[in-house]
Amino acid sequence: QLTRAGTPPIALLETQTRSDFLVSLRHVVGALRGWRYLVKGLSMLSELRRAGVKRNVGVTDVSISGVEFATGVRFKYRGRSRELNSDAILLHHGVVPNTQIARSIGVSHKWNEQGHYFSAVIDVWGECDQAGVFIVGDSAGIGGAQAAAVNGRIAALRVLYKAGRISENILADKASVLRAQLRKEMAVRPFLDSAYPPALQALMPIDSTVVCRCEEVTAGDIRGY
């Protein structure tokens, strides 16, 4: 988006390691079912290269310089310490489900080891352990916009069935078609999840890392609580 707006970033720092990439290769064949997402990703990387954005893969020890405001970012790349001057730094360490609403009504949650996040416990229809409550989209898990829409349709079918508006046969037939679409949409996820796992630095931040910017709470504050 920045590149297309005419203000491309000066660099892209990725914490992905060589071992992450090698592990992801076992999922390549399955990911080909979602080839459009792979083509889209390669196209975006090509767009960044054409714009002159330097891509640094395998960086570690990332930290932001500055006191009152950001002045740059420090990191290690290929064993050497480096620093880039910048007053606008965008951080991203993966996407996690939005669980606030589900937690507020007492929905049970489980730990997702692959994505390192908690997600609501739901059945194949999206229904949770709170009667009549269905959870789909980014509140249930990470699968992308198209997968979220399909999950929404599956949940809607179940609601119609429970309300007596459609028969069990119609429910099964229509759900079967939607589940086939969902498998196709989700085919690329194992590859992406293993190729781009959350960085260890993000999972185990040092004490000075600001965890909550609003309240200026650091990782050390939380550990000492």
Regions found by a protein language model. Give the residues of each.
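Residues forming the flavin
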Residues: 1-225
